[in-house]
Amino acid sequence: GRTNTPEFGFKNISDGQLHGNVNLPFDHSRNAGGSSGGAAAAVSSGMVPIAGASDGGGSIRIPASFNGLIGLKPSRGRIPVGPSSYRGWQGASSHFALTKSVRDTKRLLYYLQSYQVESPFPLKKLSKESLFEFSVSKPLKIAVLMDSPLKTKVSSEAKAAIKEAADFLSQKGNHLELVEQPLDGIHSMKTYCMMNSVETAAMFDDIEKSLGRSMEFSDMELMTWAMYQSGQRVLAKDYSKLLDSWDQFAATMARFHENYDLILTAATNQPAPFHGQFDLDETLQKQLRHMGEFSVSEQQDLIWKMFEDSMAWTPFTHQPNLTGQPSLAIPTHLTKEGLPLGVQLTAAKGREDLLLAVAELFEKEKQFKGPVYH
């Protein structure tokens, strides 16, 4: 089946002019998240046990957090890509699924993974032993990040979720250390927004060729139009520098994981938002409609402003997409209102086995919480 998403997967909620909002199954005044919101709602409502999803900046992990599900973004290169495109969003985007159990997550990962020679990012496959028989036999060193990489305020509920998970991991004999952000989160997010703009412009260039005409404002939603317009103005040399910065981010995190096995953060800063909570004001909408009239720097500032409120809601997820690391949202916390808000575990590239072994520890000790969990 096919599930609802925001147009081209640009948002951390699922709404749109075509099919409307995706409701959080247990509170229809709230959004199920995005961009894989329809998939999350299908799983959390019990329609299906597993639903395919993709994650270019948190689009699996964010709805997992809101819906009380397990959401794995695999390592770059783990899941097959192509043949139409081999580097979705320059490697930031990964395909996988939303699930309810670690068992299902492991099995799906084992059978979907591939060592893909023609891929620009081939990755050695995980063995059956590493996925199904590996267990944590010695204390882990876990870095705890309490602050937002975007310098935005972290909610008391997000802090509570981190503390609960940290306390549990500490009780199991692991060593946890509160650390500073290893990357410049604002800079990394700006590169991410620029990438989205350029890739949108490239996508519409192909669409124009297939349609035999130019794209118009009426062909797409406002936020998509703004991305399309701004992406056409970015210089090739600046895009090259952007991609080089991603390689530097990845190198920094590889060194970071020489000292730490895992990173623990909140998966989202808040539970599921209300429908319409991130609607843009009329002044900004007018500016976005006339995006082509602004300079490149002004356009990038407007893109940031366009996503500012929603980014503050979910500031923790984008960096693993840039570095290629595997990252996992698990349902370990309920807010005072009884709404899910997950935590996020991130490992070194290729270490999904470690992520899932730790997730299984939470699961076996009945640490998973949420309206749907069985």
Roles of regions detected by a PLM:
Residues 73-164, 186, 366-374:
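A short helix-breaking turn/cap at a secondary-structure junction
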